[in-house]
């Protein structure tokens, strides 16, 4: 067996024989990242980070730049595809106990936070009506920070309101953060292969491993092909499926949209924020909705790694999935009954999963006569 590091990393990497399709999403995320970086570069070449020209420059890209419409749609819909893959990737980690590889899990959650920041900055760049107001509402949450809030907000905005300096710095951040994501992704993969992937049974896979290439690389290729095919179908036939109608109008600080909401992939966190009728409480809940994922490796009490043989934990996991979908749906609705109570119930259920996990693990140990 040759001992060349690159060959070992990509070809002769030993992987468990029984890993399922749920393990394909890492390579799909890598493809999404490559696609976003490439299309983002071509868009940045033609984009102008100025509040008077940004909206027009997007129209110029779509209408006048050769294949500009495709680059713009691939970048916008590619972001949605990125988040679909990352949420499934995290759900897989929660279900199969991948979080017990602590360093990999921590680097992954850090990646998620940077990715969400990058996507938020990107959403502001077209300078459409919803871009402007979503940026105003979300950045305004910084004012909830005691003592430092107003100073922090003014510092982020580069003035006393969202204006040209804000757009310029958001563009700079949106351009530079993907490089941080690329470097951290490399670290994420290196940390993963220190210990190796887990598997659906949650057992030690060392007794039965096969080379990554050709076995798992071809398996990855199938789902990658389906993802790219889906992406191209949406780009070609339904390019505006994820767009907000308000964002087809140029930003107007004097007209507030009837219902301000971010992109769909932030709606679960936005729904949790809205469910608390207090600015600081809502901002804390918003941050905690992501940060609570960091606690999972330390609250695992079950003797079994995976949820495959843990019916109570499975029930809570699928409750979490349905809760996530319900919060996302409720956050698209206006703040009025019955959506207020739906948001509050689902937000409570969301956090209940993380609180109940250690209790259920302990209970399942008792049921299976483990100490």
UniProtKB/Swiss-Prot annotation:
Keywords: Electron transport, Heme, Iron, Membrane, Metal-binding, Mitochondrion, Mitochondrion inner membrane, Respiratory chain, Transmembrane, Transmembrane helix, Transport, Ubiquinone. One of its GO terms (biological process) is mitochondrial electron transport, ubiquinol to cytochrome c. Binds 2 heme b groups non-covalently. The chain crosses the membrane at residues 25-45, 69-90, 105-125, 170-190, 218-238, 280-300, 312-332, 339-358. One of its GO terms (cellular component) is mitochondrial inner membrane. InterPro entries: Cyt_b/b6_C, Cyt_b/b6_C_sf, Cyt_b/b6_N, Cytb/b6-like_sf, Cytochrome_b, Cytochrome_b_C_euk/bac, Cytochrome_b_N_euk/bac, Di-haem_cyt_TM. Pfam families: Cytochrom_B_C (PF00032), Cytochrome_B (PF00033). It is a multi-pass membrane protein. Its main location: mitochondrion. The keyword Phosphoprotein does not apply. It comes from the Eukaryota. This is Cytochrome b. The lineage of its organism: Eukaryota, Metazoa, Chordata, Craniata, Vertebrata.
């Amino acid at each position: 067996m040759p001992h060349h590091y690159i060959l070992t990393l990509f070809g002769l990497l030993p992987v468990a024989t029984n890993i399922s399709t749920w393990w394909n999403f890492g390579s799909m995320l890598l493809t999404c990242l490559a696609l976003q970086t490439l299309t983002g570069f071509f868009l940045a070449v033609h984009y102008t980070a100025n509040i008077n020209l940004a909206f027009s420059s997007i129209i110029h890209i779509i209408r006048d730049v050769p294949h500009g419409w495709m680059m713009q749609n691939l970048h916008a819909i590619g972001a949605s595809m990125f988040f679909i893959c990352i949420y499934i990737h995290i759900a897989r980690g929660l279900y199969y106990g991948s979080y017990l590889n602590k360093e990999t899990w921590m680097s992954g959650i850090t990646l998620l936070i940077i990715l969400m920041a990058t996507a938020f900055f990107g959403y502001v760049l077209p300078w459409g009506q919803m871009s402007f107001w979503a940026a105003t509402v979300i950045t305004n949450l910084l004012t909830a920070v005691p003592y430092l809030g107003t100073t922090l907000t003014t510092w982020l905005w580069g003035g006393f309101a969202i204006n040209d300096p804000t757009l310029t710095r958001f563009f700079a951040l949106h351009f530079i953060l993907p490089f941080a994501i690329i470097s951290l992704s490399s670290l994420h993969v290196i940390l993963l292969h220190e210990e190796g992937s887990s598997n659906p049974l949650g057992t030690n896979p060392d007794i039965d491993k096969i080379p990554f290439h050709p076995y798992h690389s071809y398996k990855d290729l199938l789902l990658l092909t389906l993802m790219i095919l889906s992406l191209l179908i949406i780009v070609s036939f339904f390019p505006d499926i994820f767009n907000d109608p308000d964002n087809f109008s140029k930003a107007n600080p004097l007209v507030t949209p009837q219902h301000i909401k971010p992109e769909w992939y932030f709606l679960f966190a936005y729904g949790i924020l809205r469910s608390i009728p207090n600015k600081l409480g809502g901002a804390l809940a918003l941050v905690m909705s992501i940060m609570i994922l960091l606690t999972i490796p330390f609250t695992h009490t079950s003797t079994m790694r995976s949820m495959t043989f843990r019916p109570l934990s499975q029930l809570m996991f699928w409750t979490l999935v349905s809760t996530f979908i319900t919060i996302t749906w409720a956050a698209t609705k206006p703040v009025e009954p019955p959506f207020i109570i739906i948001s509050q119930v689902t937000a409570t259920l969301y956090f209940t999963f993380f609180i109940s996990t250690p209790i259920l693990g302990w209970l399942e140990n008792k049921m299976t006569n483990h100490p």
